[in-house]
């Protein structure tokens, strides 16, 4: 068809091509922990936390811009990706303990924390329990504020199906659920996640990750108004127009409970705004993280 444009192929490597970055592993409290790192160690530290069933590749489109200003770490969280699995149901306290062990391992006393979905839940709890270690906080379509049975069932069903039978179709269904634009294939992200889910024992690992979709376990891990009210770090709550886990009103409600929190809305994005519209995300994210710092 005349004038038709061939869609630009999207890949993790083209996102990282030309970026001075490192992939590696370190010991965080006895847990072999995978990371992606970019930026000078002399810069302030920024740690990026992905969502349930995810991995560090969630942030491949953000490393280059953030590395100009921060020693930037995207990690595979406890029990996720290629990081060690403890072999028990995972609750927020377990993730926070692993996160603080990671900060100790890289020698970072105080950091900027930015988390998406589950990562935002963990980051918020870390800011409550360890206020001296969190300089600034970003909650990106963060979980942990409510228990929506339908959303919980959807996450559990899609995630367990992808882990039990990691075919192209089941893994792609899990990835597309995150995104506002369902027309794209997201092939490289699908392939990366498929390889993770094909690891021996990953069905059991996914069961442990999905513990927070159990109503009883989730209830004892939720953050309430009192918890959010104890956050002292400057906070950005970033939400999207098409988030599949919670509407914009929930994002605004979270922001209203955190003293002095800023709220920003990105349109045309789902649950991965840092990937779906990296340019807009980076501008908002860095604008907040760098506010008041020397140029």
Please state what every model-predicted region is.
Residues 231, 237-239:
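Short beta-strand/loop motif that positions the catalytic acidic residue
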Residues 33, 150, 168-229:
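Conserved alpha/beta-hydrolase catalytic His-Asp/Glu region
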Residues 31, 36-82:
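Conserved HGGG/HGGXW glycine-rich cap/lid loop of the alpha/beta-hydrolase fold
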Residues 1-45, 69-70, 108-109, 286-295:
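Alpha/beta-hydrolase fold catalytic core
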Residues 93-111:
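Conserved acidic catalytic loop of the alpha/beta-hydrolase fold
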Residues 124, 128, 135-169:
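Flexible "cap/lid" loop of the alpha/beta hydrolase fold
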Residues 242-246:
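Acidic catalytic loop of the alpha/beta-hydrolase fold
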Residues 260-295:
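Catalytic active-site module of serine/aspartate enzymes centered on a nucleophile-bearing elbow/loop
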């Amino acid at each position: 068809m005349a004038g038709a444009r061939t869609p630009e192929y999207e890949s993790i490597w083209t996102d990282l091509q030309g970026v001075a970055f490192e992939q590696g592993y370190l010991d965080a409290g006895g847990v072999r922990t995978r990371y992606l790192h970019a930026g000078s160690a002399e810069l302030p530290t920024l740690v990026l936390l992905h969502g349930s069933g995810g991995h560090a590749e969630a942030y491949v489109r953000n490393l280059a811009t953030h590395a100009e200003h921060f020693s930037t770490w995207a990690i595979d969280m406890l029990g996720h990706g290629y990081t060690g699995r403890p072999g028990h149901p995972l609750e927020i306290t377990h993730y926070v303990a692993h996160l603080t062990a990671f900060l100790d391992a890289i020698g970072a006393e105080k950091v900027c924390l930015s988390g998406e979905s589950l990562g935002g839940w963990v980051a918020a709890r870390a800011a409550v329990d360890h206020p001296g270690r969190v300089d600034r906080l970003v909650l990106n379509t963060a979980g942990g504020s409510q228990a929506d049975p339908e959303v919980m069932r959807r996450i559990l069903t899609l995630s367990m199906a992808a882990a039990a039978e990691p075919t192209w179709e089941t893994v792609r269904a899990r990835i597309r659920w995150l995104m506002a634009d369902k027309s794209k294939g997201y092939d490289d992200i699908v392939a990366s996640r498929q390889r993770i889910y094909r690891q021996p024992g990953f069905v059991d690992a996914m069961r442990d990750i999905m513990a927070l979709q159990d109503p009883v376990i989730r209830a004892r891990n939720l953050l309430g108004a009192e918890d959010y009210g104890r956050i002292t770090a400057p906070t950005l709550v970033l939400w999207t127009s098409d988030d599949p886990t919670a509407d914009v009103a929930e994002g605004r409600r979270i922001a209203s409970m955190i003293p002095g929190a800023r709220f920003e809305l990105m349109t045309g994005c789902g649950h991965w705004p840092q990937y779906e519209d990296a340019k807009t995300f980076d501008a908002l994210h860095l604008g907040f993280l760098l506010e008041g710092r020397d140029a």
